[in-house]
Amino acid sequence: MNHSKKVLNVFSLVMINVIAVDSLRTLPISAKLGFSLVFYYIFAALTFFIPVALVAAELATAYPNTGGIYVWVREAFGRRAGFITIWLQWIYNVVWYPTMLAFIAATLSYLIAPHLGNNKFYLLGTALTLFWVFTFLNCFGMKLSSIVSIIGASIGTLLPMIVIIVLGAVWIFQDRPVAVNYPTTWLPDFSSLGNLSLFSAVLFGLIGMEMSAVHAEEVKNPQRDYPKALFYSALLIISTLSLGSLAIVIVVPNDSLSVVSGLVDAYAIFFNSYNMPWMTSVIAVLIILGGLSGVSAWIIGPTKGLLVSARDGSLPALFSRVNKYGSPVAILLTQGVIFTVLSTVFILLDSINAAYWVLSDLSAQMALLVYIMMFAAAIKLRYSKPEQPRGYTIPGGNLVMSLISGIGIICCIAAMIVGFIPPSQIPIKNVFLFECFLIGGLILFVFIPWLFAKKHDEQLCSEE
């Protein structure tokens, strides 16, 4: 191990984690939980967020190769399992894109005509336009630098996050009126499973720590500093997401809270009350710039793992090719077609909130499957490849690793189960269409990679 490359201190790793995980898009949907969101975030941190970070740190330092989860699962369970995992990681991002672009479109509407934020045709048209523009730019190798993306994430995510937390704190200290139709309890209502459905959205809002885990080996003293950085990261991320969501809770009535435009609605209420309505537009511009600076990376990023898998032979040869700009055009265009079809859910379902939730839920379901595979791989590799050098190792031996990974697996399965139940907080009139879209999408997107992987294995056997 080259110690000259160990350049990250605890603070650096904490900031990498915060930028990777913190998201404004999560705040409105978390706010739907009312004050009980604090319980959800603390519970999610203990049963999912921290286990993911610990397990990913060990795996990333044991297998620092490019490929991440794909490599980890492949080493544990073989190429077919690795391909299914990287496919799911790609497709859940594709399903997630419409929600993120709808969020940007709703924020953009505040600069044009605020009422458009509740117009499903405007959201659909804007999301499709933005996605295809950035897809074609990526096809020609036109990307923003990582520095620009980091700056955009900072001013477009962290700054607005801090602003809404400060506004919420000032509002409370000034004893201003608080929205009262939220549950006043800090504990969830366990009387109905529908009240727990949004837990999968809370978990989905906390994904991303495995991407920053690749930096664990660059920490000066991994065994000492990585757990310390993890503790501070978890504290900061859970605090910012909880407090940001609570700021929305105290000013936007639950019945009128949009999970798409709810964040900007909250800013508008705050700034209008302080006779600073122009500040809503300033914040909206920051959010849009931050979002757009990341769109290019979101579109091209997940295709890289799929390209590696395609070159392994797990997909038709067409998907393993790149153009003269180094862009996987076939994957990008396929991604665009799937995005376009999925985006029509904004028209098919009865409300924007319902459409936004079903896409978020389907994304979360597939993401949780990926994490189940990651946890299972961590346990398997401890027993099958104990001799593999690890820059960071979860202390306590195989028993503690199995316990931590087991808690993560149980948490993911529980969240998936309640995710199939329509949430009490988001009325869904056409429950049949909701269930068909969710179950059908899950079956389709899991069956396709299994089919490709099975066909590839059969070809290998026939060649041998």
From Swiss-Prot:
Keywords: Cell membrane, Membrane, Transmembrane, Transmembrane helix, Transport. The keyword Iron-sulfur does not apply. GO terms for molecular function: transmembrane transporter activity. One of its GO terms (cellular component) is plasma membrane. It comes from the Bacteria. It holds the Pfam family AA_permease_2. The chain crosses the membrane at residues 7-27, 37-57, 94-114, 121-141, 153-173, 196-216, 231-251, 282-302, 329-349, 359-379, 401-421, 432-452. It is a multi-pass membrane protein. It is found in: Cell membrane. Belongs to the amino acid-polyamine-organocation (APC) superfamily. This is Uncharacterized transporter lpg1691. It comes from Legionella pneumophila subsp. pneumophila (strain Philadelphia 1 / ATCC 33152 / DSM 7513).
